[in-house]
A protein has these predicted regions:
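Amphipathic alpha-helical packing segments from all-alpha helical-bundle domains
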Residues: 93, 110-137, 147
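Amphipathic alpha-helical segments used for helix-helix packing
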Residues: 59-60, 90-117
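Basic, helix-initiating cap at the start of DNA-binding domains
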Residues: 1-37, 54
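C-terminal peripheral helix-coil segments that are non-catalytic and often amphipathic
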Residues: 81, 125, 129-136, 163-195
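Short hydrophobic/aromatic patch on the recognition helix
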Residues: 38-49
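Hydrophobic alpha-helical segments that form the core
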Residues: 141-163, 173-180
Length: 195
């Protein structure tokens, strides 16, 4: 376990990295700039993160909150729970601001591309589990490709945040999930209960 002072330095470096990413993009993040902004020695940054990319990766992943995967017995309730959580935490909002910057930089930098893939994998994990549970319950077809199902569910939110650069409101969440759930459950292997 890291010592308290070490933990404080770690947090200060990650916070400074996120601030720099938001202000200057990936190209604006240097170990020198993070050291100056955070008050953490460059040697400490190298010891904790090994490289600029390691620092960016840790900062981006730090914005991904691990949400417990719900299992309410209802695809609709599980998705509403997750998307409610995704859109209402500060770290999640920061992540949605960071992702377009990282995606743009990923076109030119394979290490940044790996970071983006890692962040998306973390974000998709609980959604994939919820969809798998829905398949097991017969709410959606067992033959439905889960990557396609994820695209149906996540696509509108990604478009809203990254292309339109608009906030994801509760009304938007409800409208999208109503449509996505209707589409997904239309593939069901069993008749859906009413109510």
């Amino acid at each position: 376990m890291a010592r308290p002072r070490s933990q404080e330095a770690h947090k200060a470096a990650l916070d400074a990295t996120v601030e720099l990413l938001l202000e200057a993009g990936v190209e604006g993040v240097t170990l020198e700039e993070v050291a100056a902004r955070s008050g953490v020695a460059k040697s400490t940054l190298y010891r904790h993160f090994e490289s600029r990319e390691g620092l960016i990766a840790k900062a981006a992943r730090g914005c991904v909150i691990e949400h417990p995967t719900p299992d309410t017995g209802s695809l609709a309730d599980d998705l509403r729970y997750l998307f409610g959580r995704f859109s209402h935490t500060e770290d999640e909002k920061r992540l949605s601001e960071l992702l377009p910057l990282l995606i743009d930089a990923a076109k030119r930098d394979p290490e940044i591309q790996a970071i983006v893939e890692s962040v998306f994998a973390e974000r998709k994990r609980p959604l994939r589990t919820v969809l798998q549970l829905a398949q097991l319950r017969g709410e959606i077809s067992r033959e439905l490709d889960l990557d396609t199902a994820l695209a149906i569910v996540v696509g509108p939110f990604t478009y809203r945040r990254m292309v339109e650069q608009r906030e994801v409101t509760d009304d938007f969440i409800d409208a999208v999930l109503n449509g996505a759930i209707a589409a997904l459950t239309s593939t069901a292997d069993v008749e859906q209960p009413v109510g």
